[in-house]
Amino acid sequence: WVGGITSLVAALMATQQNDIKKILAYSTLSQLGYMVMAVGLIAPEAGMFHLFTHAWFKALLFLGSGAVIYACHHEQDIWKMGGLLKKMPITAITFLIGTLSLTAVPFTSGFYSKENILIAAKDSPLLYIAVGVAALTTFYMFRLFFIAFLGKARDHGSKVAKEVPVVMWAPLALLTAAAIASPFFSQFFPTNGHVEVHAVPHFGDKLVLMSLGAFATGFVFAFLLYFGKDKEPISIPLFRNKFYLDIIYQRLVTVFQDAVAALVHFFDEFIIGGLLVDGATRSAQGVGNIFRRFAQNGSLSSYAYLMGLGAVLVIYFTVFAK
Protein backbone atom coordinates (compact mmCIF):
# COMPACT_ATOMS: atom_id res chain seq x y z
CA TRP A 1 0.00 0.00 0.00
CA VAL A 2 2.89 2.38 0.64
CA GLY A 3 4.07 1.94 -2.94
CA GLY A 4 0.57 2.17 -4.38
CA ILE A 5 -0.35 5.35 -2.51
CA THR A 6 3.02 6.91 -3.32
CA SER A 7 2.52 6.10 -6.98
CA LEU A 8 -0.98 7.60 -7.00
CA VAL A 9 -0.12 10.78 -5.10
CA ALA A 10 2.96 11.49 -7.24
CA ALA A 11 0.97 10.92 -10.44
CA LEU A 12 -1.71 13.38 -9.29
CA MET A 13 1.00 15.94 -8.54
CA ALA A 14 2.45 15.52 -12.04
CA THR A 15 -0.88 16.30 -13.72
CA GLN A 16 -0.71 19.98 -12.71
CA GLN A 17 2.99 20.79 -12.97
CA ASN A 18 4.26 23.15 -15.69
CA ASP A 19 8.01 22.63 -15.28
CA ILE A 20 9.06 19.89 -17.71
CA LYS A 21 11.66 18.55 -15.28
CA LYS A 22 9.21 18.50 -12.38
CA ILE A 23 6.72 16.51 -14.44
CA LEU A 24 9.36 13.88 -15.15
CA ALA A 25 10.59 13.97 -11.55
CA TYR A 26 7.14 13.27 -10.11
CA SER A 27 6.65 10.68 -12.82
CA THR A 28 9.81 8.94 -11.63
CA LEU A 29 8.55 9.02 -8.05
CA SER A 30 5.27 7.53 -9.23
CA GLN A 31 7.00 4.72 -11.11
CA LEU A 32 9.21 3.97 -8.11
CA GLY A 33 6.02 3.60 -6.12
CA TYR A 34 4.87 1.13 -8.78
CA MET A 35 8.02 -0.91 -8.22
CA VAL A 36 7.69 -0.86 -4.44
CA MET A 37 4.08 -1.94 -4.83
CA ALA A 38 5.27 -4.94 -6.84
CA VAL A 39 7.69 -5.87 -4.06
CA GLY A 40 4.86 -5.61 -1.53
CA LEU A 41 2.79 -7.93 -3.71
CA ILE A 42 5.54 -10.58 -3.39
CA ALA A 43 6.67 -10.00 -6.97
CA PRO A 44 10.11 -8.40 -6.61
CA GLU A 45 11.17 -9.77 -10.00
CA ALA A 46 8.34 -7.78 -11.63
CA GLY A 47 9.48 -4.66 -9.78
CA MET A 48 13.09 -5.20 -10.85
CA PHE A 49 12.00 -5.81 -14.45
CA HIS A 50 10.08 -2.52 -14.44
CA LEU A 51 13.09 -0.80 -12.86
CA PHE A 52 15.23 -2.14 -15.72
CA THR A 53 12.92 -1.01 -18.51
CA HIS A 54 12.07 2.25 -16.76
CA ALA A 55 15.75 3.16 -16.59
CA TRP A 56 15.95 3.26 -20.39
CA PHE A 57 12.85 5.23 -21.30
CA LYS A 58 13.09 7.61 -18.34
CA ALA A 59 16.74 8.34 -19.22
CA LEU A 60 15.47 9.02 -22.75
CA LEU A 61 12.82 11.41 -21.46
CA PHE A 62 15.18 13.28 -19.15
CA LEU A 63 17.81 13.67 -21.86
CA GLY A 64 15.08 14.72 -24.26
CA SER A 65 13.85 17.34 -21.81
CA GLY A 66 17.43 18.55 -21.45
CA ALA A 67 17.66 18.93 -25.22
CA VAL A 68 14.40 20.89 -25.23
CA ILE A 69 15.57 23.17 -22.42
CA TYR A 70 18.87 23.73 -24.25
CA ALA A 71 17.13 24.55 -27.53
CA CYS A 72 14.65 26.89 -25.83
CA HIS A 73 17.40 28.88 -24.13
CA HIS A 74 16.98 27.27 -20.71
CA GLU A 75 13.22 27.66 -20.60
CA GLN A 76 11.53 24.91 -18.54
CA ASP A 77 7.89 26.05 -18.51
CA ILE A 78 6.00 23.92 -21.03
CA TRP A 79 3.43 26.71 -21.53
CA LYS A 80 6.23 28.87 -22.94
CA MET A 81 7.14 26.22 -25.50
CA GLY A 82 5.04 24.87 -28.37
CA GLY A 83 5.57 23.83 -31.98
CA LEU A 84 8.78 21.96 -31.20
CA LEU A 85 7.82 18.95 -33.32
CA LYS A 86 8.54 20.96 -36.48
CA LYS A 87 11.64 22.66 -35.13
CA MET A 88 13.17 19.63 -33.36
CA PRO A 89 11.80 16.55 -35.16
CA ILE A 90 14.41 14.05 -33.94
CA THR A 91 14.12 15.14 -30.32
CA ALA A 92 10.33 15.23 -30.56
CA ILE A 93 10.02 11.75 -32.09
CA THR A 94 12.42 10.17 -29.59
CA PHE A 95 10.58 11.94 -26.76
CA LEU A 96 7.29 10.60 -28.12
CA ILE A 97 8.67 7.05 -28.16
CA GLY A 98 9.83 7.48 -24.58
CA THR A 99 6.34 8.74 -23.72
CA LEU A 100 4.77 5.72 -25.39
CA SER A 101 7.05 3.43 -23.40
CA LEU A 102 6.22 5.13 -20.12
CA THR A 103 2.51 4.98 -20.88
CA ALA A 104 2.71 1.24 -21.65
CA VAL A 105 1.78 1.22 -25.33
CA PRO A 106 2.07 -2.31 -26.79
CA PHE A 107 5.44 -3.32 -28.25
CA THR A 108 7.28 -0.86 -26.02
CA SER A 109 9.24 -1.84 -22.93
CA GLY A 110 6.84 -0.23 -20.47
CA PHE A 111 3.94 -2.33 -21.74
CA TYR A 112 5.57 -5.62 -20.83
CA SER A 113 7.02 -4.57 -17.48
CA LYS A 114 3.79 -2.90 -16.32
CA GLU A 115 1.79 -5.94 -17.37
CA ASN A 116 3.80 -8.05 -14.95
CA ILE A 117 2.95 -5.68 -12.09
CA LEU A 118 -0.73 -5.80 -13.03
CA ILE A 119 -0.55 -9.60 -12.99
CA ALA A 120 0.96 -9.44 -9.50
CA ALA A 121 -1.90 -7.17 -8.36
CA LYS A 122 -4.73 -9.05 -10.06
CA ASP A 123 -6.08 -10.48 -6.78
CA SER A 124 -5.54 -7.30 -4.76
CA PRO A 125 -7.46 -4.01 -4.45
CA LEU A 126 -4.18 -2.40 -5.50
CA LEU A 127 -5.03 -3.44 -9.05
CA TYR A 128 -7.42 -0.47 -9.28
CA ILE A 129 -4.74 1.91 -8.05
CA ALA A 130 -2.27 0.45 -10.56
CA VAL A 131 -4.71 0.89 -13.45
CA GLY A 132 -5.65 4.38 -12.26
CA VAL A 133 -2.00 5.41 -12.08
CA ALA A 134 -1.49 4.06 -15.60
CA ALA A 135 -4.31 6.31 -16.84
CA LEU A 136 -2.88 9.32 -14.99
CA THR A 137 0.57 8.60 -16.42
CA THR A 138 -0.83 8.69 -19.95
CA PHE A 139 -2.73 11.87 -19.14
CA TYR A 140 0.16 13.94 -17.79
CA MET A 141 2.70 12.71 -20.35
CA PHE A 142 0.51 13.51 -23.35
CA ARG A 143 -0.43 16.78 -21.67
CA LEU A 144 3.29 17.56 -21.71
CA PHE A 145 3.68 16.43 -25.32
CA PHE A 146 0.64 18.30 -26.66
CA ILE A 147 1.65 21.54 -24.95
CA ALA A 148 5.40 21.52 -25.59
CA PHE A 149 5.72 19.85 -28.99
CA LEU A 150 2.45 20.60 -30.80
CA GLY A 151 0.56 23.81 -31.43
CA LYS A 152 2.37 27.09 -31.97
CA ALA A 153 5.42 28.62 -30.36
CA ARG A 154 4.38 30.76 -27.40
CA ASP A 155 7.67 32.37 -26.38
CA HIS A 156 10.87 33.64 -27.94
CA GLY A 157 12.81 30.56 -26.85
CA SER A 158 10.52 28.15 -28.67
CA LYS A 159 10.28 30.45 -31.70
CA VAL A 160 14.04 30.37 -32.30
CA ALA A 161 14.54 26.75 -31.19
CA LYS A 162 16.25 24.35 -33.59
CA GLU A 163 17.33 20.74 -33.54
CA VAL A 164 20.18 19.99 -31.14
CA PRO A 165 23.55 18.85 -32.54
CA VAL A 166 24.26 15.20 -33.25
CA VAL A 167 26.25 14.74 -30.05
CA MET A 168 23.00 15.41 -28.18
CA TRP A 169 20.46 13.53 -30.29
CA ALA A 170 22.63 10.45 -30.95
CA PRO A 171 22.26 9.25 -27.31
CA LEU A 172 18.52 9.84 -27.67
CA ALA A 173 18.45 7.51 -30.66
CA LEU A 174 20.35 4.80 -28.77
CA LEU A 175 18.05 5.08 -25.77
CA THR A 176 15.04 4.94 -28.08
CA ALA A 177 16.22 1.57 -29.37
CA ALA A 178 16.77 0.37 -25.80
CA ALA A 179 13.32 1.60 -24.77
CA ILE A 180 11.84 -0.71 -27.37
CA ALA A 181 14.19 -3.71 -27.18
CA SER A 182 14.89 -3.90 -23.43
CA PRO A 183 11.93 -6.21 -22.63
CA PHE A 184 13.60 -9.02 -24.51
CA PHE A 185 16.17 -9.21 -21.72
CA SER A 186 13.46 -10.44 -19.35
CA GLN A 187 15.04 -13.90 -19.36
CA PHE A 188 17.72 -12.53 -17.05
CA PHE A 189 15.16 -11.83 -14.31
CA PRO A 190 14.54 -15.04 -12.35
CA THR A 191 11.09 -15.76 -10.99
CA ASN A 192 10.06 -16.93 -7.55
CA GLY A 193 6.92 -18.72 -8.64
CA HIS A 194 4.48 -15.87 -7.97
CA VAL A 195 4.83 -14.00 -11.25
CA GLU A 196 6.47 -15.08 -14.45
CA VAL A 197 8.40 -12.21 -16.01
CA HIS A 198 7.79 -12.26 -19.73
CA ALA A 199 8.09 -10.09 -22.81
CA VAL A 200 5.33 -11.79 -24.81
CA PRO A 201 2.07 -9.83 -24.91
CA HIS A 202 -1.12 -11.57 -23.77
CA PHE A 203 -3.62 -9.60 -25.81
CA GLY A 204 -6.52 -11.79 -24.78
CA ASP A 205 -5.92 -11.25 -21.11
CA LYS A 206 -8.36 -9.07 -19.15
CA LEU A 207 -5.47 -7.25 -17.49
CA VAL A 208 -4.05 -6.23 -20.85
CA LEU A 209 -7.44 -4.87 -21.84
CA MET A 210 -7.53 -2.91 -18.59
CA SER A 211 -4.06 -1.54 -19.35
CA LEU A 212 -5.09 -0.52 -22.86
CA GLY A 213 -8.28 0.98 -21.47
CA ALA A 214 -6.24 3.04 -18.99
CA PHE A 215 -4.06 4.30 -21.84
CA ALA A 216 -7.07 5.19 -23.97
CA THR A 217 -8.76 7.00 -21.08
CA GLY A 218 -5.70 9.07 -20.22
CA PHE A 219 -5.02 9.89 -23.87
CA VAL A 220 -8.59 10.97 -24.62
CA PHE A 221 -8.76 13.27 -21.59
CA ALA A 222 -5.35 14.77 -22.40
CA PHE A 223 -6.42 15.31 -26.02
CA LEU A 224 -9.74 16.91 -25.14
CA LEU A 225 -8.28 19.20 -22.49
CA TYR A 226 -4.91 20.20 -23.94
CA PHE A 227 -4.68 19.62 -27.68
CA GLY A 228 -4.40 23.02 -29.36
CA LYS A 229 -4.69 24.92 -26.08
CA ASP A 230 -2.50 27.93 -25.25
CA LYS A 231 -3.32 28.17 -21.56
CA GLU A 232 -4.21 25.86 -18.70
CA PRO A 233 -7.92 24.96 -19.00
CA ILE A 234 -8.21 23.53 -15.50
CA SER A 235 -6.52 24.36 -12.23
CA ILE A 236 -6.53 22.07 -9.23
CA PRO A 237 -4.62 23.83 -6.43
CA LEU A 238 -4.37 20.66 -4.36
CA PHE A 239 -2.39 18.91 -7.10
CA ARG A 240 -0.54 22.00 -8.29
CA ASN A 241 0.68 22.68 -4.75
CA LYS A 242 1.66 19.03 -4.28
CA PHE A 243 -0.98 18.34 -1.65
CA TYR A 244 0.57 21.22 0.32
CA LEU A 245 3.24 18.84 1.55
CA ASP A 246 5.91 21.53 1.30
CA ILE A 247 3.82 23.89 3.43
CA ILE A 248 3.09 21.14 5.92
CA TYR A 249 6.78 20.39 6.07
CA GLN A 250 7.61 24.04 6.64
CA ARG A 251 4.87 24.58 9.23
CA LEU A 252 5.20 21.36 11.21
CA VAL A 253 8.43 19.53 10.53
CA THR A 254 10.56 22.66 10.33
CA VAL A 255 9.04 24.11 13.52
CA PHE A 256 9.65 20.86 15.38
CA GLN A 257 13.13 20.67 13.92
CA ASP A 258 13.90 24.25 14.99
CA ALA A 259 12.60 23.56 18.51
CA VAL A 260 14.78 20.49 18.87
CA ALA A 261 17.74 22.41 17.44
CA ALA A 262 17.18 25.22 19.97
CA LEU A 263 17.03 22.70 22.83
CA VAL A 264 20.21 21.00 21.66
CA HIS A 265 21.89 24.39 21.28
CA PHE A 266 20.88 25.35 24.83
CA PHE A 267 22.18 22.04 26.20
CA ASP A 268 25.45 22.39 24.30
CA GLU A 269 25.93 26.08 25.07
CA PHE A 270 24.93 26.23 28.73
CA ILE A 271 25.16 22.68 30.09
CA ILE A 272 28.14 21.22 28.29
CA GLY A 273 29.93 24.44 27.45
CA GLY A 274 28.86 26.58 30.39
CA LEU A 275 28.76 24.15 33.30
CA LEU A 276 31.02 21.27 32.33
CA VAL A 277 33.76 22.80 30.20
CA ASP A 278 33.85 26.43 31.35
CA GLY A 279 32.61 25.49 34.84
CA ALA A 280 35.40 22.98 35.35
CA THR A 281 37.90 25.54 34.12
CA ARG A 282 36.60 28.23 36.46
CA SER A 283 36.54 25.77 39.38
CA ALA A 284 40.15 24.78 38.77
CA GLN A 285 41.13 28.42 38.50
CA GLY A 286 39.28 29.26 41.74
CA VAL A 287 40.90 26.44 43.70
CA GLY A 288 44.26 27.38 42.26
CA ASN A 289 43.78 31.00 43.28
CA ILE A 290 42.93 29.93 46.84
CA PHE A 291 46.06 27.83 47.12
CA ARG A 292 48.10 30.52 45.45
CA ARG A 293 46.96 33.13 47.94
CA PHE A 294 47.65 30.78 50.82
CA ALA A 295 50.96 29.41 49.57
CA GLN A 296 52.43 32.48 47.91
CA ASN A 297 51.71 35.22 50.43
CA GLY A 298 55.33 36.38 50.99
CA SER A 299 55.43 35.10 54.63
CA LEU A 300 58.56 33.11 55.52
CA SER A 301 56.78 31.33 58.36
CA SER A 302 54.04 30.15 55.98
CA TYR A 303 56.64 28.75 53.62
CA ALA A 304 58.35 26.93 56.50
CA TYR A 305 55.00 25.56 57.67
CA LEU A 306 54.13 24.24 54.22
CA MET A 307 57.59 22.74 53.79
CA GLY A 308 57.24 20.92 57.10
CA LEU A 309 53.74 19.75 56.22
CA GLY A 310 54.99 18.45 52.91
CA ALA A 311 57.84 16.59 54.56
CA VAL A 312 55.46 14.97 57.05
CA LEU A 313 53.15 13.85 54.22
CA VAL A 314 56.04 12.38 52.25
CA ILE A 315 57.29 10.44 55.27
CA TYR A 316 53.77 9.24 56.10
CA PHE A 317 53.04 7.93 52.60
CA THR A 318 56.51 6.43 52.31
CA VAL A 319 56.57 4.63 55.66
CA PHE A 320 52.97 4.00 56.68
CA ALA A 321 51.04 3.87 53.42
CA LYS A 322 51.78 0.17 52.89
State the predicted function of each range.
Residues 161-219:
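Hard-cation-handling environments
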Residues 134-136, 176-180, 211-221, 253, ...:
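Hydrophobic cores of alpha-helical transmembrane segments in multi-pass integral membrane proteins
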Residues 192-206, 231-322:
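Aromatic-capped, Gly/Pro-kinked transmembrane alpha-helices
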Residues 1-163, 178-184:
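Hydrophobic transmembrane alpha-helices and their helix-loop junctions in integral membrane proteins
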Residues 49-52, 125-130, 205-210, 296-304:
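Membrane-entry segments of alpha-helical transmembrane domains in multi-pass membrane proteins
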